[in-house]
Amino acid sequence: MINIYDSANQLAQDLTKTDQYKAVGDAVKAVQADDESAALFKKMDEIQAKIMQAQQTGKPLSDEDQKAYQELNAQVQKNDKIVALLKSEQGLYDLLGEIQKAYTKPINDLYEGLRN
C-alpha cells in the first residue's frame, strides 16, 4: 500500500529546490535587510489579518481600516523590495496552482462520466 504522505513530503522538499521558491526566499531576505521595507511589510501583514478576520466574521471593515489599507497599499506599490516579493510570491502560487491541477486530475477524471 502506498503512503501518500511520503509523496507529499517529497513534493514539499522538491518545492524548496524550485526557482520560484528560491526567488521568494531571496525577496524575503531583501525585505528583511531593509528596515523601511520590513516595517511596511509588517503593517501590511497586520491590516491583511484584520481584513481576513472581518471577512470571516461577516463584519464590514471599518472606514478607518479601509482608509489605512488604501494608504498602505499606495506605499507598498512604491516599495521596490515589497513589489519584488509580491511578484515572486505570484510566481510560486502559479507553480502551486499547476501542481494542484496535476494531483487533482485523477479526482476530476472520476467525475468525467457524470459531466458528459
From Swiss-Prot:
- InterPro entries the UniProt entry points to: Com_YlbF, YheA/YmcA-like_dom_sf
SUPFAM superfamilies given for it?
YheA/YmcA-like (SSF158622)
A matching Pfam family:
Com_YlbF
Family matches, as HAMAP family: UPF0342
**Family of the protein in this entry:** Belongs to the UPF0342 family.
This chain belongs to the protein called UPF0342 protein lhv_1666
Species this protein is from: Lactobacillus helveticus (strain DPC 4571)
The uppermost taxa in this organism's lineage are: Bacteria, Bacillati, Bacillota, Bacilli, Lactobacillales
